[in-house]
């Protein structure tokens, strides 16, 4: 594709809308700024899809990033841009709205990920992750006011190796991985996508001190209606699928009084 314009598809993942979701004004503001920066760098408008995650929830963000990136076949035309910044790296007062730094990686399939390095936002990524030479302060709304030029620059560099990108900083060696037995995502049906490893001796599970017996199966529909089951689900990559806690015909999330990604699932053998 070298020598002609590339059309970029950007998945933009952010924690703006606990109430407003993808309709939050912040998404539109960032989308507009991205379009402006692409034009400034002589590129066509990107196609942008917004995805809202829970406020400050880096587990949910990291899961969404990996699920979309690893399963893509768009290569370097696909950029994942994410912004979930709890600003928990330093609990003292911050100057000039400083927060966690921007980071970048490229997967073997060519998809590039650029976003705030905070908590578990890169916790499912196995490729090398690098700092981006970009300011980490200057605005309360860094995803609109500070980061978009870096995203556009990364796209501009799509035909070249990431190692030659002028904004590439040092490699990050300490990347937190998401713990076992953790809820990673909750879909619209109330199925809980988790990092639980299937084991024959799991007889019940407990979430936030709410306990129910559970069966195991090869799929979420391999039990009668109304039964709670732990089974491989529809999410995952490279042949590895996340186990899901599902209530057939109902909502496991409602049954366990609406846990959130990051909550721990306790496994019981009896």
Segment roles from a protein language model:
Residues 30, 42-48, 54-63, 74-76, ...:
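Active-site histidine-anchored catalytic micro-motif
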